[in-house]
Each structure stands twice: as C-alpha cells, then as structure tokens.
Amino acid sequence: MNKPLIPFNHLNPFNHVNLFNFLNHFNHHKSMSKKVKYTILLFIMAIANFPALANDFVTVSQDGDFILRDKPYKYAGTNFWYGAILGSKGEGGDRERLSAELDSLQAIGIDNLRILAGGDGNHSIPSHIEPTLQTEPGVYNQDILEGLDYLIAELEKRDMRAVIYLNNAWEWSGGYGTYLEWTGHGEAPLPLRDGYENYMKYVSKFITDDKAKELYANHVRNMVTRVNSITGKPYSESPAIMSWQIANEPRCFDPANKEAFYNWLVDTGNLIKSLDPNHLVSTGSEGMWGCEGDIDLWARIHNSDAIDYANIHIWPYNWNWVKPESLAEDLPQAITNTKDYISSHRALTKKPLVLEEFGFPRENMEIAKGSSTASRDAYYEYVLNLMVNSNDLNGINFWGWGGNANPAHKTWQPGDPYTGDPAQEDQGLNSVFSSDRSTVD
C-alpha cells in the first residue's frame, strides 16, 4: 500500500496519486476566487516538478553507513529482475501485476529492489529472457525502455529504491556473450547446451576486447542519461534509483585478466559518475567467488573511489555447501560458511557492504508453489537477523521475488508469467511467492 502523505514542510509531498487527490479537493473549494485558485495551482504545479532534494538520494557517510534523509539507512530488499518487462505496454507487460507486486512488497517491508535494466540480443535463444531491451548495439526496444520508465515512476510514488544493473556476465540476459557476438567472436555458447567451461572460456574475452567494452560503455551512456518519458525527469534526478550497477556478477573468467578486470570496473564506475553525480555506483560482484578466488582483488576494486559500496552474493546450494538430499542437516554448516564469507569481506572495507543475492532451495529441491520452505526460512532468518543486529551488513536482497506468478512450465516459455527465476532456471527454484506465508510473514 502507499505510504501516508508526507507533510508539506518535509520533502515534496506531491507524488502523482496524492497530487491528483489534492487537486480534486482543491478544485471543489467554493470559497476561493478563481484568481486565487489559479495562482495557488501554478505554485503547486511548480513544486510538483521540482527536482528531488539532495537528501532524497542515498549517500554514504564517512563512517561507512548508507544515509537517507539524514538518517542511517539499512534495508531488506529483493531481486526483481523482470520489473521493467512488467512495466511495458508490449510483449510481456503487465502493469496491473506490477502495481500489485510493488504494493505487496511494500506491505511486508521490502523497499529496495535489484532490477535488470533490460536484456541484450535477439529473440528465441534458449535460456535467454524475452523480450530484450537492446536488440542491436545502441538499438532499443521502446516498449521495454518505457517499461523501465514506468517502473521507476511507480517506485517514486511508493518511496521505494532500485539498484539497476546494466550488464550481465551470464547468458540469461545476453550481457558479455552478446557484446562478443556483436564484435565478431562468433556465436556464444550456451552453458546448459555447451557446458559452463566452454561458456566461461568464450566470455573471458570480453574483459580484453576494447570494441565490446566500448559498445557496453555506449549503452551505459544511453541508459544513465535517459529522460523518463512518464515523469519528464532525467534518470539522474530520480530518487527511486539508489545505485547504478555495472553488471550482474561481473567476472574476468581468467586469472590472466585480473588487472584488465580491475581497470574495466574502475573506468566504468568513473564513467557513470561523470554522467550522474547524484547516484551511487556499485559493481554487482559476488565477492571473492567472482574474483577468481582473489579476495584482495575484490577489496582493491571496492575500495576504489570509483565504487561507492561493496557487494557480495552467497549461494549455499550452488557452492556445494548443502546437498539436495540433506538440506536441513547441512543448514548449520551453510550458516557457518555464510558468517565466515561475510566476515572475511567485511574486514577488508570500511564501505557499506550489501549481500545483494542469496537463495536457498525448498525442501527436496521442490519447485512447486506450496512446497515446504522450512530450511530456506531458517536461512533467511539468520541472514536478516545478522543484518539487523550487527554492523556486518548494511543491506540484503534475497533472490528472488516470484510474487503472484503461477509458473506454467518447469522451463520458461514465451508467454509464461515471469518469476524470480530467469529463463535458464527451473521456474520456482529460487522464487519466493506471495503464497509462501512462512517466508514473507
């Protein structure tokens, strides 16, 4: 549900819904002359179009805290990769569902969403999401662009925040592989078809390919400098954006590329800052797991002035901390490993640290809605309590929100509802649905 109207003397109270209601009441005020009404109306509309105040943006304090409206900001959030698609009026769009999902999230205290700006490349590639945003270098699907505009406008209404990632090391949204295809490296392997080793060998070329990186830099320029077609405001002035993120789980995929990887992340961070001084910049890193096991490289990247805060991801099942047949029995070890992974990274930076991806399977690796989430619930509870009761974490985003979706197939097919699981994953595998009451209550 929407938050109550903010008092007039604190920030800008006139979001679209409240402004409409106010003007409707104002227009029927009979004791006021038309001239006075007109003057006040002009004043109100001017205020409504003021840029966001400086303290509407999330910043970082010298003490290593997020700050929002002059107060420390810690958050519990989720991953909502498909938000821009839902906001579209075209293929895949469902604005009614988007509004319902945002309201549901806000009602359970989730005010921070990590979202994909949009996918890259052509349609009809197995395990790729559809529709994509960037169909060719610098050529955009206007429906998805306007879907992102709509999503940002809806977040502004609800005083929610988004972390928007602009690239992906993995195949499901195009990312590295698509940029390499566009620069003459041949067809990108698909991990589920051709094996992860072949995929990683192929995409390791992105970090050292100047043409591919420049195509991506142009995409950054196009997105960060965009003007929202709904609000009329540049993205750089939207308080709904907490951070621009360089990529989802960026990796160099080859120890020989570590220095080039560092330089690319720093250069991209500086590029974003030159285009948008209002918003934070983050990497989207998994931590040492995404730096070829080199935690010092992770620290060097995140302590750079080009990066405002630090990211890590944790996947107990993917990282073989738990086995499918013994999730409950392996849970204590997963919690111990989680604590150690967080602590080892926390010790190497004074900047805010966000665990922006973590997931845990349902019992017996079930994917059906209604199946038990007992071990997942216990793991989530541990992570949430750690964030709330310690200084180890400044924010968390679980993966991912499935909300009201009813998966139609185990493997996603065009026309199926979007869940927290992208097209390369079993639908329901890591999704938290609205019906998972033991998780969301």
Q: Where are each of the predicted segments found?
A:
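Bacterial N-terminal signal peptides that target proteins for export
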Residues: 29-40
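Residue-level micro-sites within transmembrane alpha helices that shape
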Residues: 36, 48, 247-248
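Boundary at the C-terminal end of the N-terminal hydrophobic targeting segment
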Residues: 52-54
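Active-site mouth of glycoside hydrolases
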Residues: 57-322, 328-352, 358-439
